[in-house]
């Protein structure tokens, strides 16, 4: 913990979010690879607080399970009845044992654009000004629906926050709004919450009333104005969800470009907050970078690629393809129109070419699967070439089975490898073969019916047809040349 690290961060995530018109709790809707509350928790963790608690209510089990499945455990408190933000914070403090020594930051769980940097500035301002409470505020073009920051005309000090429904016409003209994010002196917060009343239009305990209570008790109330008002955007409907996704995507792409990644067309590129990259990676238009994807130095992806939970090696190329939970080695080539499913590991300078699908397959260094093939549940050695239109037949109707092909093999076009089967090193297979038995190293495997030509069949069985006429003309031409 640093000198300005808060003692506790309380995240409010108990509301239902009826305006989302969804069976999914509002805070679990996702943008840029994380849920709304997941983004808030990630920002809060940047402050390295001693305690982090999320107050849950609506769909308690679902939200708690989501939080438990995250990168690190999150403590939760339960607000059984939705009695307002003040009541929610009381539930959070009770989970922490009551009064907290030090700074307590309260943040809403539906503000995914809020950055750790802004939260850090709030904590620093709170400590430097020795405030009892510091509100994170913002100047916005349209303050409709937000609580207004009311200041003393003479001193500029914050006197109260008035909710939109309770504001006068004069107060509704104020453009400085409450973000719903606060820093409190933990020693004073608990007592002040106990004095909050419910005589307002909603009949709820407003957390904002704590400001007036503390100010009237002679304590200092301050504000920290956010540098970018868009950070405090709260999500209440699908329109705001889409806007937040757009803004966050722009921020993430800007960060990537400043780190040395070339993004050819940011407007058509999507990136998740969990994606990592190295300098001189190139992202072409229409590309989605999702999940825990990593782009190594000099890698190149797109156009029109979906790269999800995939490690793309240095200098590798992915063109017009989909990769899911795959590993692509340095200098490897994927696509166009390839599909790498989970468990695919493509070796250094290997190739999964046009219309190739792979699943749970390990492909060795320099090995190529160039065209029109399915490789499932397989291990292929180094510097092997798989012929076009090959199928690794891995399913017998009950269970999946594995195929192993060695190094420096050359398999013919239109082969089928019926698992379980092992093909040794240096093997050649003939085109059209169905390989059902193991092939020893250095062998040529031929597994197809012998060709039989029945001469004159077309003339006898299809007399007068175009084929028969063409055959007759060809025969006459041949006879004339002899």
From Swiss-Prot:
Active site residues of this protein: 371 (proton acceptor)
InterPro entries, per database record: Bifunctional_GlmU (IPR005882), GlmU-like (IPR050065), GlmU_C_LbH (IPR038009), Hexapep (IPR001451), MobA-like_NTP_Trfase (IPR025877), Nucleotide-diphossugar_trans (IPR029044), Trimer_LpxA-like_sf (IPR011004)
Region: N-acetyltransferase, residue numbers: 260-482
Pfam families per UniProt: Hexapep, NTP_transf_3
Major subcellular site: cytoplasm
Binding site residues for UDP-N-acetyl-alpha-D-glucosamine: 12-15, 26, 79, 84-85, 147, 163, 178, 236, 341, 359, 374, 385
Cofactor note text: Binds 1 Mg(2+) ion per subunit.
Tagged with keyword Aminoacyl-tRNA synthetase: no
Region (Disordered): 458-482
Pathway: Nucleotide-sugar biosynthesis; UDP-N-acetyl-alpha-D-glucosamine biosynthesis; N-acetyl-alpha-D-glucosamine 1-phosphate from alpha-D-glucosamine 6-phosphate (route II): step 2/2; Nucleotide-sugar biosynthesis; UDP-N-acetyl-alpha-D-glucosamine biosynthesis; UDP-N-acetyl-alpha-D-glucosamine from N-acetyl-alpha-D-glucosamine 1-phosphate: step 1/1; Bacterial outer membrane biogenesis; LPS lipid A biosynthesis
Biased composition (Low complexity): 465-476
Region Pyrophosphorylase: start-end pairs: 1-238
Protein's GO biological process: cell morphogenesis; cell wall organization; lipid A biosynthetic process; peptidoglycan biosynthetic process; regulation of cell shape; UDP-N-acetylglucosamine biosynthetic process
EC number per UniProt: 2.7.7.23, 2.3.1.157
Cofactor: Mg(2+)
Region entry Linker, spans: 239-259
Cellular localisation: Cytoplasm
A Gene Ontology cellular-component term: cytoplasm
Function: Catalyzes the last two sequential reactions in the de novo biosynthetic pathway for UDP-N-acetylglucosamine (UDP-GlcNAc). The C-terminal domain catalyzes the transfer of acetyl group from acetyl coenzyme A to glucosamine-1-phosphate (GlcN-1-P) to produce N-acetylglucosamine-1-phosphate (GlcNAc-1-P), which is converted into UDP-GlcNAc by the transfer of uridine 5-monophosphate (from uridine 5-triphosphate), a reaction catalyzed by the N-terminal domain.
Assembly: Homotrimer.
Membership in a protein family: In the N-terminal section; belongs to the N-acetylglucosamine-1-phosphate uridyltransferase family. In the C-terminal section; belongs to the transferase hexapeptide repeat family.
Protein name: Bifunctional protein GlmU
Lineage of origin: Bacteria, Bacillati, Actinomycetota, Actinomycetes, Kitasatosporales
Gene name linked to the record: glmU
């Amino acid at each position: 913990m640093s000198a300005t690290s808060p003692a506790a961060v309380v995240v409010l995530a108990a509301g239902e979010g009826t305006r989302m018109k969804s069976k999914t709790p509002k805070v679990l809707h996702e943008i840029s690879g994380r849920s709304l509350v997941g983004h808030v928790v990630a920002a809060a963790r940047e402050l390295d607080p001693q305690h982090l608690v999320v107050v849950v209510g609506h769909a308690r089990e679902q939200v708690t399970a989501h939080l438990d499945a995250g990168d690190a455990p999150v403590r939760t408190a339960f607000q059984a009845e939705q009695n307002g933000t003040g009541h929610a914070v009381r539930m959070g403090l009770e989970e922490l044992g009551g009064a907290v020594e030090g700074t307590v930051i309260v943040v809403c769980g539906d503000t995914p654009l809020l950055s750790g940097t802004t939260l850090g500035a709030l904590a620093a301002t709170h400590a430097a000004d020795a405030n009892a409470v510091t509100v994170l505020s913002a100047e916005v073009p349209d303050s409709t629906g937000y609580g207004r920051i009311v200041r003393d005309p003479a001193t500029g000090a914050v006197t109260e926050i008035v909710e939109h429904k309770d504001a006068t016409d004069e107060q509704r003209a104020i453009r400085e709004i409450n973000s719903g994010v606060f820093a409190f002196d933990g020693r004073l917060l608990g007592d002040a919450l106990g004095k909050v009343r419910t005589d307002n239009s909603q009949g709820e305990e407003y957390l904002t009333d704590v400001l007036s209570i503390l100010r009237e008790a002679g304590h200092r109330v301050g504000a920290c104005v956010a540098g970018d008002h868009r950070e405090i955007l709260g999500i209440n409907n699908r329109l705001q969800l889409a806007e937040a996704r757009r803004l966050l995507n722009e921020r993430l792409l800007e960060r990537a470009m400043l780190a040395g990644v070339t993004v050819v067309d940011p407007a058509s590129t999507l990136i998740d907050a969990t994606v990592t990259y190295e300098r001189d990676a190139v992202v072409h238009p229409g590309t989605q970078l999702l999940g825990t994807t990593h782009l190594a130095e000099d890698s190149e992806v797109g156009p029109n690629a979906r790269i999800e939970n995939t490690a793309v090696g240095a200098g590798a190329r992915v063109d017009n393809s989909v990769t899911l939970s795959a590993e692509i080695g340095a200098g490897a080539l994927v696509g166009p129109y390839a599909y790498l499913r989970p468990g695919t590991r493509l070796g250094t300078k290997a190739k999964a070419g046009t219309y190739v699908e792979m699943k749970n397959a390990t492909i060795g260094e320099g090995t190529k699967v160039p065209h029109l093939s399915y490789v499932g549940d397989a291990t292929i050695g180094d510097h092997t070439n798989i012929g076009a239109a090959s199928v690794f037949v891995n399913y017998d109707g009950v269970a999946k089975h594995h195929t192993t092909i060695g190094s420096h093999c050359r398999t013919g076009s239109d082969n089928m490898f019926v698992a379980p089967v092992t093909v040794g090193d240096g093997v050649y297979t003939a085109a059209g073969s169905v390989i059902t038995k193991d092939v020893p190293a250095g062998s040529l495997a031929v597994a197809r019916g012998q060709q039989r030509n029945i001469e004159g069949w077309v003339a006898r069985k299809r007399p007068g047809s175009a084929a028969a006429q063409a055959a007759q003309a060809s025969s006459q031409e041949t006879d004339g040349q002899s």
